[in-house]
Amino acid sequence: MIVTTTNTIEGKEIEEYLGIVAGEVILGANVVRDFLASITDIIGGRSGTYESKLAEGREMAIKEMVNKARSLGANAVIGVDLDFETLRDGMMMCIATGTAVRLKS
């Protein structure tokens, strides 16, 4: 499955647009991890804990989006966009959206 942020795929022709697909993931962060991450942020370092959480959320959201595209008969997802939102109580939401398409063979 080709997944791209562009609206076209060089050298490929889109046979059919199958619709918008999305993958949503909500992840929680615990108090101890938040505390340690805040210490890292205060002393000026990067927060590896949150960076890994962001990467995990991104991968899970893309995987869910791809699964939905496959169920529509797609072999590619174009125009992919990723959004991250902070929710209350230490929750984080990652959303991957794109357009499921079938490319000509």
Curated annotation (Swiss-Prot):
- Note the superkingdom of the native organism: Bacteria
Span of the signal peptide: none
The protein's matches in HAMAP family, at most eight in alphabetical order, are given as: UPF0145
Q: Which family does it belong to?
A: Belongs to the UPF0145 family.
From the Swiss-Prot or TrEMBL record, give the protein name: UPF0145 protein GK1405
- Which source organism? Geobacillus kaustophilus (strain HTA426)
Q: What is the lineage of its organism?
A: Bacteria, Bacillati, Bacillota, Bacilli, Bacillales
